[in-house]
Design a protein with these regions (language model features):
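Ferredoxin-type iron-sulfur electron-transfer modules and their immediate structural context
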Residues: 1-145
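N-terminal Rossmann-like FAD-binding beta1-loop-alpha1 element of flavoenzymes
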Residues: 142-166
Length: 166
């Protein structure tokens, strides 16, 4: 429960600037499984989860951290995506340092915050790799009706509504 006392905060490793200049990829190396589980286990499961309170989406952060620490990643992904339509994006671009991580109870006690954003990114990258993310079909499809015989050959599309089975 109080693993944050013995396990120090670790962020994702950053790729060197020299390497990053060669290609346009992410600048951080994703957590390895053991490191993600270890960092998730640092969550103190406090009574009032200030991380969740200060998340604009009110993500159930303590619960998916606990599931990650227990290596139940598919359940962690399902819980993460139940309150967030794009958790794989939020793990990368959300300003966690000012929101969830910035209000972490163990950060305020001097032990370093739980690396919530890095763990969220790890959960969702793992979900993509394992095919847990289900593709949702759009209600709208487009079909090409014909091409105009004018310069530029503009296309005229017809839109067909596929009504959901309700």
């Amino acid at each position: 429960m109080l693993k944050f006392v013995n396990i120090s905060k670790q962020n994702e490793d950053k790729i060197s600037l020299k390497e990053r200049k060669k290609y346009f990829e992410e600048i951080y190396i994703n957590f390895a499984k053991e490191k993600a589980n270890q960092q998730a286990s640092r969550c103190s499961q406090c009574g009032v989860p200030f991380c969740q309170v200060h998340c604009p989406l009110h993500n159930n952060i303590p619960d998916w951290l606990k599931l990650t620490a227990e290596n139940r990643l598919q359940e962690a992904y399902e819980l993460s995506s139940s309150t967030n339509n794009m958790p794989e994006v939020c793990g990368r671009i959300c300003p966690q340092d000012r929101l969830c991580e910035g209000n972490c109870v163990i950060e305020n006690s001097g032990h370093g915050t739980v690396t919530i954003g890095s763990i969220e990114k790890y959960i969702n990258d793992t979900a993509w790799e394992n095919g847990w993310i289900k593709k949702e079909c759009s209600l709208w499809t487009e079909n090409l009706k014909h091409r105009q015989h004018l310069e530029g050959g503009l296309k005229i599309h017809g839109t067909v509504l596929q009504a959901p089975n309700i």
